[in-house]
């Protein structure tokens, strides 16, 4: 059972609204206060009964909280932290849910130097966003990565781990640097590819003035599903994780050039071996938990 009695959730998109629902479902004794900068989102949160209190004042939301869960875009973390800082209790724990860790941790530490911060990243989601997109089961059996540093109190880490486990998550610990490299490979690069692929095909369609995408089969739809994700959110992620993403992107481009060379030179042996190795890796992935991005 979580030790937290009052949780404030800042940002009510997919992750924030799901955390609110999950907290109410699995931690019914916890008071949940909610804040989002959007009046429309706040009104939807009230209509959906996502929390005990939905406020238009971020300081009111966090004033009594012993856990503040930050579910805002990574480039909004600093603004949010500065806005809520004067109202925070001394012993409150701050936990972000961002997809980038190194830069976000620095931003939070700069703005909240006297508070305990336990960075986290639930590896759960869909291409949908907003308070209506969330659901209480989102985190069930999905990894939640915690990236504390040497100065993070062990008790605070345990409290945050217990909370995520209470609402369904599976805890993993790693350094912030390793997290950003891993996510550049497994999440951020796939989003780059999805946005670029559907953008390229759409461009072909517009230029040729002939229908193309109406003939897309399952492979195209699967490969581009995450391009339906919120663009501004992913703009922030790409820019904030550029130090980890750019080398990964360079590696991908180099490998793509090798494939092009093999196709141009009719090197079937290279293609077959490459496809076999890739198939083997994908089939092995199916035996583990299939994580939504």
UniProtKB/Swiss-Prot annotation:
InterPro entries attached to this UniProt entry: 6-PGluconate_DH-like_C_sf, NAD(P)-bd_dom_sf, PDH_C, PDH_N, Preph/Arog_dehydrog, Prephen_DH
GO MF term (any one): prephenate dehydrogenase (NADP+) activity
Domain of life of the source: Bacteria
Catalytic activity: L-arogenate + NAD(+) = L-tyrosine + CO2 + NADH; prephenate + NAD(+) = 3-(4-hydroxyphenyl)pyruvate + CO2 + NADH
Keyword Transferase in annotation: no
Binding residues annotated for NAD(+), in chain numbering: 6-30
Enzyme Commission no: 1.3.1.43, 1.3.1.12
Gene3D superfamilies, per the entry: 6-phosphogluconate dehydrogenase C-terminal like domain (1.10.3660.10), NAD(P)-binding Rossmann-like Domain (3.40.50.720)
pH-dependence annotation: Optimum pH is 6.6 for both activities.
Family stated for the protein in its record: Belongs to the prephenate/arogenate dehydrogenase family.
Name this polypeptide is given: Cyclohexadienyl dehydrogenase
Chain's gene name: tyrC
């Amino acid at each position: 059972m979580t030790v937290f009695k009052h949780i404030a959730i800042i940002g009510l998109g997919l992750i924030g609204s799901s955390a609110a629902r999950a907290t109410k479902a699995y931690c019914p004794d916890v008071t949940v206060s909610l804040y989002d900068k959007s009046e429309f989102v706040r009104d939807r949160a009230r209509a959906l009964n996502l929390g005990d209190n939905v406020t238009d004042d971020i300081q009111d939301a966090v004033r009594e909280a012993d856990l503040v869960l930050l579910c805002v875009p990574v480039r909004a973390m600093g603004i949010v932290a500065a806005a809520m800082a004067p109202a925070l209790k001394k012993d409150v724990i701050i936990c972000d849910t961002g997809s980038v860790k190194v830069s976000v941790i620095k931003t939070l530490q700069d703005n909240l130097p006297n508070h305990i911060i336990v960075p986290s990243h639930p590896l759960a989601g869909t291409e949908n966003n907003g308070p209506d997109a969330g659901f209480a089961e989102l985190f069930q059996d999905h990894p939640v990565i915690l990236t504390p540093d040497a100065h993070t109190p062990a008790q605070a880490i345990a409290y945050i781990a217990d909370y995520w486990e209470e609402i369904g998550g599976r805890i993993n610990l790693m350094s912030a640097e390793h997290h950003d490299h891993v996510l550049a490979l497994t999440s951020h690069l796939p989003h780059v590819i999805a946005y670029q692929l559907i953008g390229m095909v759409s461009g072909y369609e517009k230029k040729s003035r002939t229908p193309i995408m109406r003939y897309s089969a399952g492979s195209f739809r699967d490969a581009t599903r995450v391009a339906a994700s919120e663009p501004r959110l992913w703009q922030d992620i790409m820019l904030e994780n550029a130090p980890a993403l750019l080398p990964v992107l360079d590696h991908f481009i180099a490998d793509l050039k090798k494939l092009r060379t093999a196709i141009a030179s009719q090197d079937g042996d290279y293609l077959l071996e490459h496809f076999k190795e890739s198939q083997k890796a994908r089939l092995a992935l199916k035996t583990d938990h299939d994580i939504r991005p």
